[in-house]
Amino acid sequence: MGTLKRAAALLLALFAAAAFAAEGDGTLLPHSQKSFEAYAQDARAYVEANRRWVTEGALRAAELEANLPHEYMPEHPDGRAILLVHGLGDSPFTFDEIARDLAKEGILVRTVLLPGCGTKPADMMKVTQEDWRRTVEEQAGLLRARSKSFWIGGYSMGGDLAIDYAARHPGEVKGLVLFSPAAAVRSRLAALAVPASHVRDWITAPEERPNGGQNPLQYLITPTKGLAAFYRTMTAAQEGLEKLEKDRWRGRWFAALAARDGLVKTEALLPQFQRIAKGTRSAFLWYGTFPKGADAAGTRALPDAIGELKIAGFSHMALTYSERNPFYGKQGTVRFCWNGQGKAESLACEKGADVCFSGDGQQPEGAGGCAKLTWNPYYGEQLKAILSVMAEP
């Protein structure tokens, strides 16, 4: 979802005279498997054959595993199960820590790899909203058949797909677990993704970015057709929320939202979630100053400025990773240093300078240049809240 920050540039795409050539071969991850095991095997073969690799040597095995769907089988399963869906251009690794922790509590967890993801940005050229919806539909059906209590959740666009699924299958879903769901974005120009996709393939082409616009875990650029598919998915989630509210859906909710999310209009989503969840066993975490006039019932606000950790705000992507995460944690190997500060500060950050951390593109006055926060210092408290909502009577 990091590429959505470029939505404003879509206006320029409408007046482009020429399009960049697509680099993908148009093939997508196979579907319609009869078991999760077959799906996971096909995904492995597909990623191995089509991925543009970022790492080399021994690290490549970890890069591969991070981009594959996985099943996390509890030692003592209790009938609960949850399907977790990653965001636009992201990977199933988004949920690796959360999935392991939920499995320890008896919950069967599966992740998916959305079509167009896990290989290279150009493979988003022919992906559609229906491709993503079909993957969720198929994998939810397989997991639901293995469970007594079926849940679905997601991060960013994956949250949109989870909401859409719940709205279309309200009687089959026990509840939703959402992290920064992108059902309302801040950019007023997001709708231009659809017309822009007909006149230009890229805003920033892969050859213009290091590693072709990706890191080991996610894409850093997305073709306009992928952004158009995202917009349609967001619209479906908005319609799904309206349906759930109108039908007075009684499923449970957990949602984690950041006040300074630079991509999602979280202050608009929180009251809508609260209305739908009223009277159910649900919980919401709000990272930052509570919105003026918002209903605090069922919602816990946690400070997003933590001086001793040099944290000035939470970003869109920070919520699903703990500070121990080997890639995105406090001492992780991946840093997002180009976060709106000056070039010199960004370069110093890349060289390992001691920096502060903030929300998407946010640079507090006098902070000296903040990298984007990529981990959640409240990860443990967040996990407890999720387990409380998912607990069986």
Segments from the language model and where they lie:
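Bacterial N-terminal signal peptides
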Residues: 9-18
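Active-site nucleophile loop of the alpha/beta-hydrolase fold
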Residues: 177-187
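Gly/Ala-rich beta-loop-alpha elbow adjacent to hydrolase catalytic centers
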Residues: 154-158, 162
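Short, surface-exposed "cap/lid" segments of acyl-processing enzymes
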Residues: 65-114
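Serine-hydrolase catalytic core
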Residues: 73-76, 221-365, 374-387
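Conserved hydrolase catalytic core segment
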Residues: 164-174
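Catalytic nucleophile-loop/oxyanion-hole region of alpha/beta-hydrolase
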Residues: 119-146, 151
